[in-house]
Every structure is written in structure tokens, then in C-alpha cells.
A protein has these predicted regions:
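N-terminal amphipathic, basic-rich helices that act as targeting or association modules
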Residues: 1-54, 213-215
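Conserved small/polar residues in nucleotide/adenosyl-binding loops
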Residues: 129, 265-267
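Mobile "lid/hinge" segments at catalytic clefts and subdomain interfaces of large enzymes
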Residues: 130-131, 135-244, 249
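Conserved short loop/turn motifs at secondary-structure junctions
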Residues: 27-29, 73-76, 204-209
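Generic structural signal for well-ordered, non-membrane alpha-helical segments
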Residues: 2, 6, 33-41, 75-86, ...
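Accessory "access/gating" subregions that flank catalytic or transport cores
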Residues: 107-116, 226-265
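Long, structured ligand/cofactor-binding scaffold of large enzymes
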Residues: 33-35, 39-148
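Structural motif
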Residues: 23-24, 55-58, 94-98, 122-124, ...
């Protein structure tokens, strides 16, 4: 039976199909930051639970980081408490943290791809609605709430109901000064802010193929503004060229196997 990219990734990560039509899905990468993780770690402490797979976690200070005068530290008291909590929790559970003084620190949905933590075929979650950004690299990525952050920390799984498939094909050449941001705003205007509700959207077509990875990330990032849970795009040569030699990319054999799985053959 033919499968979409969404179908492929979902089926490969499905541990169990439940009687209520939900499924237990394995999560490959968990991105955490200071805003939605403190309560999740508190939940682990209360329930005396440990973390299932520390290596799957990428932790960074993100939402409360000042854009100027960083040498003065965090001045907002609430923001400071959240960042201190992230530091303490990462230290307690031996999770590597990309803190303010680390050159790898940055916006979570930017450094994931830049470091090669975001990889094709992965399931990726984060306590942030715009996690769909990572779908530009052929991953199934979506935001989760704090209770689910705790659940992934403890079990590496989530109980989910599968979305419906939604393909948006875009062809033609973008005019000068028209960007991917304009394109996704046009799409949202066309289908409405709830037009993608209950769907995962896959973007295809020559226009998408001609976009840079960064431009693709913009489209996937804003997919949730159309009400969809996630947006994703197929793996191609641009994806390969963007990811090659990234620090956390897996060994060549593993990656080559993934490429065969994800690549499309056009006849």
C-alpha cells in the first residue's frame, strides 16, 4: 500500500495500536528549554521516576535569553528562576545543557538543525508550538504540553491519535522579493486558520524543491498557524547537502541507510 512520508515515519515509530484508535509512538529526539520543563522535572521527582534516554535530549536556554547585554545576566526575576531550574535539573539528571556561555546555545528550533540533532525520519517533540519547524528536514515534529514533556522524559513514548494527511503542492517560480514567509501566509489565507486542524501537512512541488532549507523551515514553522499539528517536506539533495558534516549526524552507514529509505525516485 502506498504511504506518504508521514505514514512512513508514523508506522516505523508505532509500538502499539490501541483499541481506541490511538497509538503508542516512540520519540527519537526531545528538545527541552527553561519554560516548559520545570514542572515536568518536578513531576518526575514527585513520582520517583528517572529519565529513560538522556542521549535523546537536547537542552538549551531559549525563550528567556536576552538579545543584548547578555553579560549582565537575566534581570527578569521569573525568567531567572526558570533558567536556574533548567540548570539544576540538567545537573541533577546529568543532561548536557547548552547554556548562555556555550557557543552551541541558541534558539532551540535553529540549533537543532544546525548541530545535526534534527535528522530525516525522526520523531521530534518539544514543549513549544513551533516544533513543526524541524519538518523541513523530513522529520515528524510537533509541539507538546508540559505533562507530555514529563511523559517523554520518563518513557520516551507518547500515546497519540494519527492525523489525516494533507498535501499542499506548490509549483511555479516565486517573483523577486516574494519569500517563503509570503508563501505560507498566502496558504494560511487560502485554507484558513483552522483549515489544517486534524491534519499533518506535507508540502510538495517544484517551488518547495527550489527553496533553501531555511526557507522551508519558515513554512513548516508557520504550519501550526493553519491549525495543523505538523508540517513536513521530503528529503532531497538540498537536505543532504545541508546536513552533511553536521556535528551530531550519525555514522555514514546509518545515515546512508536512512537516505535510501527517505529518498524519492523521479521517473
Amino acid at each position: 500500500m502506498k504511504q506518504t512520508l508521514y505514514d512512513k515515519i508514523w508506522n516505523d515509530h508505532c509500538i502499539l495500536d490501541n483499541d481506541d484508535h490511538s497509538s503508542l509512538i516512540y520519540i527519537d529526539r526531545h528538545l527541552i528549554h527553561e519554560v516548559t520543563s520545570p514542572q515536568a522535572f518536578d513531576g518526575l521527582e514527585i513520582k520517583k521516576r528517572d529519565i529513560w534516554n538522556k542521549k535523546s535530549i537536547m537542552a538549551t536556554t531559549d525563550h528567556n535569553v536576552p538579545t543584548i547585554n547578555r553579560d549582565q545576566g537575566i534581570t527578569d526575576p521569573v525568567s531567572k528562576i526558570q533558567i536556574e531550574a533548567l540548570r539544576e535539573n540538567c545537573k541533577k539528571y546529568n543532561i548536557e545543557l547548552y547554556d548562555l556561555d556555550n557557543l552551541k546555545q541558541g534558539i532551540v528550533h535553529v540549533i537543532g538543525p544546525e548541530l545535526g540533532m534534527t535528522q530525516p525520519g525522526m520523531t521530534i517533540v518539544c514543549g513549544d508550538s513551533h516544533t513543526s519547524t524541524h519538518g523541513a528536514l523530513a522529520s515528524l515534529s510537533f509541539g507538546i504540553g508540559t505533562s507530555d514533556v514529563e511523559h517523554v522524559l520518563a518513557t520516551q513514548c507518547l500515546n497519540l491519535t494519527k492525523d489525516k494527511n494533507f498535501n499542499i503542492e506548490v509549483n511555479g517560480v516565486l517573483h523577486p522579493y516574494i519569500t517563503s514567509k509570503d508563501l505560507i501566509l498566502y496558504i494560511i489565507g487560502s485554507i484558513g486558520t483552522s483549515g489544517g486542524t486534524g491534519y499533518t501537512i506535507e508540502y510538495t512541488g517544484e517551488t518547495i524543491s527550489n527553496l533553501s532549507i531555511e526557507s522551508r523551515m519558515t513554512i513548516c514553522n508557520m504550519t501550526i498557524e493553519a491549525g495543523a499539528k505538523s508540517g513536513l517536506m521530503a528529503f532531497d539533495e538540498k537536505t543532504h547537502d545541508y546536513l552533511k558534516d553536521r556535528e551530531f549526524l550519525p555514522s555514514s552507514k546509518y545515515y546512508d541507510d536512512a537516505l535510501k529509505y527517505l529518498s524519492l525516485i523521479h521517473i
